[in-house]
Swiss-Prot record:
Transmembrane segments: none annotated. Belongs to the primate lentivirus group gag polyprotein family. Residues 8-43 are annotated as: Interaction with host CALM1. The modification Phosphoserine is found at residue 144. The modification Asymmetric dimethylarginine is found at residues 382, 403. Residues 114-130 have a biased composition (Polar residues). This is Gag polyprotein. The record marks 128-129, 359-360, 372-373, 426-427, 442-443 as: Cleavage. Pfam families: Gag_p17 (PF00540), Gag_p24 (PF00607), Gag_p24_C (PF19317), Gag_p6 (PF08705), zf-CCHC (PF00098). GO terms for molecular function: RNA binding; structural molecule activity; zinc ion binding. PANTHER family: ENDOGENOUS RETROVIRUS GROUP K MEMBER 24 GAG POLYPROTEIN-RELATED, PTHR40389:SF4. A zinc finger (CCHC-type) spans 384-401, 405-422. Gag-Pol polyprotein: Specific enzymatic cleavages by the viral protease yield mature proteins. It comes from Human immunodeficiency virus type 1 group M subtype A (isolate U455).
Length: 493
C-alpha cells in the first residue's frame, strides 16, 4: 500500500484529505481512495504511475471522458477521483468533488477555444490525416486503432460483400498511401483475396508508369520528383514525400489515386465472392416483392458495369424476373413507374389477402364458364333458373331460400326430380303415360296367336261385317312396336 499511496505527500496530501466527497457531506478523501484508483486503472490497462503528475492525470481524464455516458458507476467514480487529484497537483483550491469537476470543465472549454482560435489564425483547416502543426507545417497523423478495428470487423463479418467497398471509401477518406497499406496489412484472413488485390495494384502501377514516363535530366532545385507507380503504392516513397505530393502546388493526389486502385481490386474480389449473376435473380412464387428487390439490388451492386447499364438492368430485369402476379401488376403500371410505385403496387402480393382474392376470381370464372355452357339448342347463352325458388340468375345449390320439399318438377312429394315420370318421353318423341302399362318401345309381353280366331270358324259367334271390323280397328289405337318401326329388317324375323 505504501507504493500506491506515495502519489501524494506533504502539503498535497493535506490538501487531498481536506476535500469532501460530496457537497455538504462529512466524508473526505483518504489514502485508500488513491489505492483504489490505482487498482482500477490497472483494470482499464492504464499506467497507475500517471497519477503522480498533473499531465498524467490530464491524459487519464482524456481517456475516460468519452466513456462516461455509457460507463458504469465505478468508471464515473474513477473519473471524479482523478479530477480531484489533478486539482491537487495544479494547486487549485476546491472544497468538494463537484467543484473540482466544474474546474476541469472550465479548463477544457478554454483549451477548446484556444485550438479553434489557432486554426482560424492559420487560415487553414486541419484535415485528417494531414494536419497542421504549431508552426503551420503539414504533418501526418496516423490512423486511429478504432478506425483500423472497424475496418477489420467489416471484413470479418461481411467477407467482401458489396457493402465492404463503401465502408472502405468512408474509412480511407483523405488517407495517405501509408495509411492505406496499413489498412490492408491488418486484414489477417482472406489471403487469396488480398493476393488478388496486390496483383491489381501492380497492374495499375505498371499502367501508370507507361502513361507517365520519367523526364530526362536533373530535377530543378526546390521541386519534387514525379511519383512512380511504386511511389503511389507506398513501397518506394516516404511519408514526407507523400505529404509533399498531396500538398504541393499543383498537388498530386497520390492517396486518392492509390485508393482508386484498391477499390478497383475490391470490385474484382466482391465479384468473385458473389458468383450469382443479376440474370439469375428471380422472384419466387410466394416471395414478397420487397425481399426480391433487396436481393436484386444487392447483386446489382456487385456487377462490374457502368451506371447506365445498371439503370437499364433495373428497368428491364426487375420486371422481367418477377413472378407472374407481380409482373402483371408492374406491366399495368407502365415503363415510367418509379420503384416506390412498384413497391406500393406489389405490397401484399403472395400474402393471405392476395391469395383469397385470386381464389375468389378463379372461382368466379369457373362458375361463369359453367353458366355459359348451359345453352338452349346451342343458340347462345341463356339465363339459368333455380328449381328451388323459381327465380333466375342462380342455381339451386346456391339458393338461399328454404329448401323446397318434394319433386322440383311436378311438385309432388314422395320422390325426387331425377325419379319423376311426369310427361317423360321416349326416344320416339311419344309421351309415356305411366298409368297405361309399359312404353311402346319395349317388346310386347303378349304373344302373337298362331291360329286364326275362333270367330272365323263359326264357333257359336256371329261373323262381323268388313265395315264394322274396319271401324273397330280405327277406334282401337295400334300398339307401337319395334317390328313396325324397322319393317322388313332381317334381324327382327
Amino acid at each position: 500500500m505504501g507504493a500506491r499511496a506515495s502519489v501524494l505527500s506533504g502539503k498535497k496530501l493535506d490538501s487531498w484529505e481536506k476535500i469532501r466527497l460530496r457537497p455538504g457531506g462529512n466524508k473526505k478523501y483518504r489514502l485508500k481512495h488513491l489505492v483504489w484508483a490505482s487498482r482500477e486503472l490497472e483494470k482499464f490497462t492504464l499506467n497507475p504511475g500517471l497519477l503522480e503528475t498533473a499531465e498524467g492525470c490530464q491524459q487519464i481524464l482524456g481517456q475516460l471522458q468519452p466513456a462516461l455516458q455509457t460507463g458504469t458507476e465505478e468508471l464515473r467514480s474513477l473519473y471524479n477521483t482523478v479530477a480531484v487529484l489533478y486539482c491537487v497537483h495544479q494547486r487549485i483550491d476546491v472544497k468538494d468533488t463537484k467543484e473540482a469537476l466544474n474546474k476541469i470543465e472550465e479548463m477544457q472549454n478554454k483549451n477548446k477555444q484556444r485550438t479553434q482560435q489557432a486554426a482560424a489564425n492559420t487560415g487553414s483547416s486541419q484535415n485528417y490525416p494531414i494536419v497542421q502543426n504549431a508552426q503551420g507545417q503539414p504533418v501526418h497523423q496516423a490512423l486511429s486503432p478504432r478506425t483500423l478495428n472497424a475496418w477489420v470487423k467489416v471484413v470479418e463479418d461481411k467477407a467482401f460483400s458489396p457493402e465492404v467497398i463503401p465502408m472502405f471509401s468512408a474509412l480511407s477518406e483523405g488517407a495517405t498511401p501509408q495509411d492505406l497499406n496499413m489498412m490492408l496489412n491488418v486484414v489477417g484472413g482472406h489471403q487469396a483475396a488480398m493476393q488478388m488485390l496486390k496483383d491489381t495494384i501492380n497492374e495499375e502501377a505498371a499502367e501508370w508508369d507507361r502513361l507517365h514516363p520519367v523526364h530526362a535530366g536533373p530535377i530543378p532545385p526546390g521541386q519534387m520528383r514525379e511519383p512512380r507507380g511504386s511511389d503511389i503504392a507506398g513501397t518506394t516513397s516516404t511519408v514526407q514525400e507523400q505529404i509533399g505530393w498531396m500538398t504541393g502546388n499543383p498537388p498530386i493526389p497520390v492517396g486518392d489515386i492509390y485508393r482508386r486502385w484498391i477499390i478497383l481490386g475490391l470490385n474484382k474480389i466482391v465479384r468473385m465472392y458473389s458468383p450469382v449473376s443479376i440474370l439469375d435473380i428471380r422472384q419466387g412464387p410466394k416471395e414478397p416483392f420487397r425481399d426480391y428487390v433487396d436481393r436484386f439490388f444487392k447483386t446489382l451492386r456487385a456487377e462490374q458495369a457502368t451506371q447506365d447499364v445498371k439503370n437499364w438492368m433495373t428497368e428491364t430485369l426487375l420486371v422481367q424476373n418477377a413472378n407472374p402476379d407481380c409482373k402483371s401488376i408492374l406491366r399495368a403500371l407502365g415503363p415510367g413507374a418509379t420503384l416506390e410505385e412498384m413497391m406500393t403496387a406489389c405490397q401484399g402480393v403472395g400474402g393471405p389477402g392476395h391469395k383469397a382474392r385470386v381464389l375468389a376470381e378463379a372461382m368466379s370464372q369457373v362458375q361463369q364458364t359453367s353458366i355459359m355452357m348451359q345453352r338452349g339448342n346451342f343458340r347462345g347463352p341463356r339465363r339459368i333458373k333455380c328449381f328451388n325458388c323459381g327465380k333466375e340468375g342462380h342455381l339451386a345449390k346456391n339458393c338461399r331460400a328454404p329448401r323446397k320439399k318434394g319433386c322440383w318438377k311436378c311438385g309432388k312429394e314422395g320422390h325426387q326430380m331425377k325419379d319423376c315420370t311426369e310427361r317423360q318421353a321416349n326416344f320416339l318423341g311419344k309421351i309415356w303415360p305411366s298409368n297405361k302399362g309399359r312404353p311402346g318401345n319395349f317388346p310386347q309381353s303378349r304373344p302373337e296367336p298362331t291360329a286364326p280366331p275362333a270367330e272365323i270358324f263359326g264357333m257359336g259367334e256371329k261373323m262381323t261385317s268388313p265395315a264394322k271390323q274396319e271401324l273397330k280397328d280405327r277406334e282401337q289405337t295400334p300398339l307401337v312396336s319395334l317390328k313396325s318401326l324397322f319393317g322388313n329388317d332381317p334381324l327382327s324375323q
